[in-house]
């Protein structure tokens, strides 16, 4: 296993090599940074920033709670994750005070127990044009694939969709038409 920035210039799709590594298949799962991928940069993926809070409190249900505009997810003893915001076409990775206050205001409408904010986090979702994940093969390179568009709703489907992707790659089992990138 290696962790490095991918250098597209080092990918040779004729010899199926990346630097010194030979491959049978290559799968890109780059999230919102797919726009930097010369093989798939035409896909309708846009960045959608989201911010979360982590809180500590006693007396809140240990069950996942949806309060209409925010969720309260248990992540440990007396710890919860609160989210989330949606800032379209924003790929900055800095949490903002305005979104923190927005989450606190929404949380206060449903949680009456005292709590302490211990973390304020943000990330960027890869949002597809139709908010449905994108899976499939490159139109010209038969062993190059993509799994993308796993925004906030689709991320829960990731285990199933990646299994479907492997079945498609290895056994040529068709992908569900709803997620097949050929729809674009």
Model feature map: region roles:
Residues 15-19:
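A structured beta-alpha segment of the ubiquitous adenosine-cofactor-binding alpha/beta core
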Residues 21-33, 162:
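Short hydrophobic core segments
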Residues 30-143:
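Active-site substrate-recognition segment that forms the wall
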Residues 1, 27, 145-147:
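Hydrophobic/aromatic beta-strand patches that form the interior of the parallel beta-sheet core
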Residues 1-14:
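A conserved short coil-to-beta-strand element within the FAD-binding core of flavoproteins
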Residues 116-184:
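C-terminal catalytic lobe of FAD-dependent flavoproteins
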């Amino acid at each position: 296993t290696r962790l490095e920035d991918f250098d597209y210039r080092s990918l040779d799709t004729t010899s199926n090599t990346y630097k010194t590594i030979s491959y049978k298949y290559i799968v890109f799962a780059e999230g919102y940074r797919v726009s930097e991928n010369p093989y798939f940069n035409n896909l309708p993926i846009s960045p959608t920033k989201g911010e979360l809070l982590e809180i500590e409190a006693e007396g809140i249900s240990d069950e996942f709670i949806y309060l209409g505009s925010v969720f309260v997810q248990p992540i440990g003893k007396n710890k919860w994750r609160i989210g989330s915001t949606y800032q379209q076409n924003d790929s900055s990775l800095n949490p903002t005070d305005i979104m923190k206050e927005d989450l606190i205001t929404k949380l206060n409408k449903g949680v009456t127990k005292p709590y302490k904010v211990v973390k304020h986090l943000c990330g960027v979702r890869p949002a597809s044009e139709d908010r449905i994940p994108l899976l499939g093969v490159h139109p010209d390179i038969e062993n190059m694939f993509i799994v993308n568009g796993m925004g906030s709703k689709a991320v829960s489907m990731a285990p199933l969709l990646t299994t479907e992707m492997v079945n498609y790659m290895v056994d040529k089992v068709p992908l569900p038409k709803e997620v097949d990138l050929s729809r674009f």
